[in-house]
Amino acid sequence: MERPISSVHFEYVALFILCTTVFASATTSQHQESQSRQHKEASYLKMVVNATELPMEEYYDYIIVGGGTAGCPLAATLSQSFRVLVLERGGVGSGNPNLMNQEGFLTNLLNAETEDSPAQAFISEEGVPNARGRVLGGSSAINAGFYSRAHRDFFDRSGLPWDLTLVNQSYQWVEKEIVFRPKLKTWQSAVRDGLLEAGVTPYNGFTLDHAKGTKIGGSTFDGSGRRHTSADLLRYARPSNIKVAVYATVERLLLAGSSAIGALYRDQRGRHHHAFLREHGEVILSAGAIGSPQLLLLSGIGPRPYLSSWGIPVAHHLPYVGHFLYDNPRNGITILPSLPLDHSLIQVVGITDSGAYIEAASNVVPFISPRHNAFVRSPLYLTVATLISKISGPLSAGFLRLASTDVDANPRVRFNYFDNLVDLERCVNGTRKIAEILRSRALKDFKFSNWFGEQDFRFIGPALPLHQTDFPRMANFCRRTVSTIWHYHGGCVVGRVVDPHLKVIGMDSLRIVDGSVFSVSPGTNPQATLMMLGRYFGFKIITERNDYK
């Protein structure tokens, strides 16, 4: 099983492993469906303004910092009853063909180093590359589009008093607008069959629910390959009650004693604006697991000694801001298949009973020979296929620290991958399951034959150890090949930074509604639950205000 391909230019293949992108072809009817969706999108774009067009001072009932995966459905819901301002540091993605179509997914991540790119790159202290959203729609506008609801244990362990009826209604509110059933092609179908051969049963077919076994999940790419993001949910907003400001960089929260009273933000021209709260209003952070704890610290909310060391005036001592930061490690293998494959995103998932989720993707990546040839101006293209293991949880926790008092600078993050041995055991379980899938009849056709008639896979990068029963070797493989699946969360977790209503502990008029409050990743992919969270808490806040009256 260990036959790496040394002749492949690894830089380009590593880029594929990082991006796990997907493409698809369109039919005429699917194109018409996509065109129909584009007409709908114009309605929410009427609510979007460049921050340069806003007054230098204005008052709102709710100021939402971050127009991302949770922020957009939250804003749409609150606008039904209140005046809402959304402050998004990035721009609008709907006019960017690279962003809104599957074909441009790789390009967006390649350009993640530029100042205004939709994806902002960062690297953990362990050296693992990662990315965060910087565009209206947030990470839902730059991800691989997989949609699946949270596992039941997530709700039991989250520390929140969930109304599960409202949870289900909130999921459905999202799904009727932006979730689609994908069509499986060669690689995804083979992996589905391989999972079943490897004992990841039962087969649950197409379902958005989290269920042990093998299933087909939802996708936020429609049949023509067009992306739908949380920004699409702004179509539910009341236009007269909402302003969505793009290129609006919040530098700090405005505080008066123990209360939030607004936000200070900067537009593209460098001018500062003040957004203030009306009576009984709230500032709601939806800037994500990197942005929300960073903004709290820059606003003087966090550990007193740490803030003082940066010369930041302490507004409120809250010792656990930036702590309990998690990232689900990803491990797996990449092969050169022996036959051509269609592009595919993550559509099939195997939910094992040993703490690992198995997923797959296939793609075409550019290959340029290290030896430049004057007669070859264009790169060749290789079809590659991956099998990926993501662990549940995780239990290993890290931290976030400031790297600068400039809000545009990425903070320092460390996730402490596999510090908890349970995480390491789950990774070994997942990689062993990948080995079983590789041995299945379903994947036999993807092997190459040698001169002696023997068949084997050709791996790009590290292959699995030959002796999969050897735990130390498998554990070393996990540590050596660790990467991210972009499901980082925490930093403002429930019970430490926010209370069960997601209000910042010890503060008034300040709440956090995003993945930074989670201490466990919801199911196989968090985006469904983050969108649900925005809708759910928008409804809850309206109910609270009505009760208050």
Language-model segments: which ranges?
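Extreme N-terminal leader/targeting segments of oxidoreductases
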Residues: 2-61, 80, 540-548
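N-terminal glycine-rich phosphate/pyrophosphate-binding loop and immediately adjacent elements
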Residues: 33-156, 163-165, 313-321, 327-333
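Redox-cofactor-proximal catalytic regions of oxidoreductases
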Residues: 104-197, 226, 387-408, 412
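A glycine-rich dinucleotide-binding beta-alpha-beta segment and adjacent secondary-structure elements
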Residues: 245-246, 251-256, 444-521
